[in-house]
UniProtKB/Swiss-Prot annotation:
Composition bias type Acidic residues, residue spans: 1-16
Record-annotated Helicase C-terminal domain positions: 291-436
Family according to the record: Belongs to the DEAD box helicase family. DECD subfamily.
Domain Helicase ATP-binding intervals: 88-263
Protein name: ATP-dependent RNA helicase sub2
Database matches in PANTHER family: ATP-DEPENDENT RNA HELICASE DBP3
Renumbered ranges of motif DEAD box: 210-213
Range of residues in the leader sequence: none
Amino acid sequence: MSHEEDLIDYSDEELQTTDAAATTAAPASNGEAKKGDLTVSGGRPDKKGSYVGIHSTGFRDFLLKEELLRAITDCGFEHPSEVQQVCIPTAILNVDVLCQAKSGLGKTAVFVLTTLHQLEPVPGECSILVMCHTRELAYQIKNEYARFSKYLPDVKTAVFYGGTPIQKDVELLSNKESYPNIVVGTPGRLNALVRDKKLSLRNVKAFVLDECDKMLDQIDMRRDVQEIFRATPADKQVMMFSATLSQEIRPVCKKFMRNPLEVYVDDDTKLTLHGLQQYYIKLSEAEKNRKLNELLDSLEFNQVIIFVKSTLRANELDKLLRECNFPSIAVHSGVSQEERIKRYKEFKEFNKRICVATDVFGRGIDIERINLAINYDLPADADSYLHRVGRAGRFGTKGLSISFVSTEDDEKVLKDIEKRFEVALPEYPEGGVDSSTYMA
């Protein structure tokens, strides 16, 4: 499978595993409903029920297991988000789901709660498989499963990703007592475990891709995903989620599914983040450090994430900040896996307030206290910008993002962002910003 076309298109025989219901499935536009900026379609095969008529004001309305409701209460969640209201009632009926919703709207909880509700754990069997594209995100998802399964003592969850000795994974999987019912991981490591027959997927009931566009866009990662997919049963439930799902990638996602419920929260061109104030500052490369120091001195914030374009710049900026007595840490692919997780936990647990990161932290990472995101280096495209600034203002809370614009390329990206999301980003005011407008 060396050509891209081979990775996108299955043969007729392979399609039988995902399109068994093609003759009876409705076209994607069938039953489309639109309310405000929410578009819902499909996902209503006979005898499977649907979300129609269900508008929940509380998680109890979803009729979830009592143990899950207790865990939800412990987490302090009262009302489901819009995406949770639409997806969960249908997803728990075993319907496939393709969902695009902005950062911070609770997509992770959709598949975590759905799969835990459906799960009947069998010792020594993996029933739920969740894949994502970075180790940090895998680690975070595993923690979400731990959080919501606290009253389900028989449920075992494990996370597998590269950068750590595979022998530890093999040992865990060779012991029936520790064998996980829920597996979370990155495609490369999971594929190695499946190929070596250390991880059996023959009992998988739910197959989940988080940040699915990132995995299916990259040829090598897509190849791993497809190989793993073929090792699972044909009649499983498939769910895919991302903050950005282009028109081009949606058909690729749907090749893995049968008549999915399609949920697109906000039109693709209007993926702005409510509650997040966004500004830019024009300056030269040489002025960046001084301006960053000024901002960190003058702005109020709980936690800040500062994005740079390379591991070298992350290390240099982190060192500079610490020399200026700013308590920062750096997270990027050049740091060992063990150290990355340690630093992630330090930041997550509020032991550090400033994090300098590359795009390894740009997607999916959910740290609720971040309310300031600074693009020290502007990203290469509009989608990456959305994912980065989405780290501030999670779940509809207030936040502030500031982007440094210093080159012609930066100006082009800024124009692309404004065009793509139909917004006009204002220049950062000389007098600064009133903290009450972005501090929750």
